[in-house]
Every structure is written in structure tokens, then in C-alpha cells.
Amino acid sequence: VVQESVLGEYVNNVKAGRFEPKIGTSEGPKSPYQITLWNGHDKKNHSWGMVIDLNSCTGCGSCLVSCQAENNVAVVGKAEVARAREMHWIRIDRYYSSDAPHEQGYSISGFKAMEEASENPEVVFQPMMCQHCSNAPCETVCPVLATTHSSEGLNQMTYNRCVGTRYCANNCPYKVRRFNWFKYFENDNFDYNMNNDLGRMVLNPDVTVRSRGVIEKCSMCVQRIQAGKLNAKKERRRPVDGEIQTACSQSCPTNAITFGDMLDENSAISKLLSVEKEGRAFHVLEEINVQPQISYLAKIRNKDEAKKKAEGAAHAEHKEHA
């Protein structure tokens, strides 16, 4: 899920720390991307995507808060979160390192040893939202076609079709779909600020307020994409790179999230992927070949330099006491 390496190894090999799965076939091991049951999507106009740099993400949660505000995501409170009924469209996954040795590989005993916490654990933050998969497992199981794929690479929801079977949430490998157990707005049990005329003014009029019994998820701020495209159309031009930003990418204080059109060769995301495609760029759970629109850049730790600094500080302290 998270891929990382140290600076010394990365300098010698830009793919250090990368996990590249292979699937056994009659023709020998192949990359999952070479094996598929589905025809590819013909994206002629735009292909929206994101690149998230794990080196830059500090886990501050700005993306989460801005997403809540932009997309009218309900604030359900501690009691509902304790029942695993949180409604965030984006979550910050947090992973800790272990002191377990790697000799046991991927055996069950090896994973048991990894449960032992490190004395000084390292942490990785990973923003996780709908990956907008081209081979989306959620789309194939919906009996009413409430979740479909757009011609621009977005996995989209049609709320008035959804009947709440939750098959899509069950089939999502990233677990990023949220079910409305209640009508959260205009409900005295949740978010009191939304129950009066003044409080409702904070709602974004460009985003549908979901009703009870439907699934919702990250839309990649499709309302902003459509507004940007319409503004460009009025001026008889294509959208300029950076003109359209999702709420999460706009609010990120470290610019860890890069959003843009991957079909635009001059866009920041295309330039970044052209450099990192054979380097740090990876997809989460590549082995299941769902072909996400969201890529991550592996985390590179400067362990060697940190160790040298610590040793230098210890030596200086010892010399001072001597």
C-alpha cells in the first residue's frame, strides 16, 4: 500500500523501494497491466487525475476539511464514527514502521512479528480517496447503474438512481465509499448548524445534498471541473493547466497533491508523471489492475544523513564532556 526507500538506495536506483507485482501466465510472468478482461476507455478530450507525493504530505488534514466544506459532506459526530459510519470522502491513512526483520518475507509468522511496535517508529501519511479506476470493481456490481465511468476518466455517482444495496462499497478494494445511514441535514441529531436558515448558507449550491439510503464518494470536485470547462468554452479555448483545482489540491499547504489533465502534455501532472513513471510513481494495489487515475510518489527517507547528524551530535557532546 505504501512504498518507501532511503536516499542512499534511491540515488543508485530511482526505483528503490518500489513493489512491482508480476502475475504468472502460460507465457511467463507479466505485469497486471498486460492482463485485463476489459477494453480500454477512449479518452479523447480530457483525462483528469492526481499525483500525491508522500514525501510532502504531513498528515495535517487540510484536504479533508476543505473537501467536507466544498462537497457538503455531513459532520456526523463521534458516536457515528465509533459505529464505522464516518462520511469523509477523503481519509488520511497513517502507517507505522516495525522493527521486525525481513528474512521471513511475506509469511504469516512474518506479519505477526510486524505487529510489534518500534521503539522509535517511523510514520507515513497517505491521503486516500476514490481512485477513479478505469477498471472499477464498483461499476460492475451496481444493479441499477448508479455508478458509471465518464469519458474523462471519472467514476461518477447518480444519486437518484442509487437504491442503497451497498454492493459497490463491498466491492471497493480501497474502502472509500460512504453510505448515508440517516438524513444528516435538517436532523436535530446531527450537525445542529445546518438546521437553521443561516447555517444552511454554508452549503455549496453547486453540489447535491445527499439523502438517506444512498452511497456517496469523492467526485474529484466535478462541479469545479465543469465550471472551469464552461468558462473556457465561453472564451473559445481549452482549460489552462492550474485553472481547475480540486478543493484538496488547492488547500494543501505543502503542494503534495497535483491535479490536472493527463492528456495535456504541458500540464504539471503530465510532466511530473513523465519524469516519475520510471521512478517513484506507483498505484496502490497495482496487482489487482483496477487502473486508478490517482498515482502516488514513493516516500524517500534521508536516514543516512539523519544517522550521521545523530552520530556527530553524540560525538560533539562526548567531546564537550571530556
Where are the model-predicted features located?
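Non-ligating segments of multi-cofactor redox enzymes
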Residues: 1-322
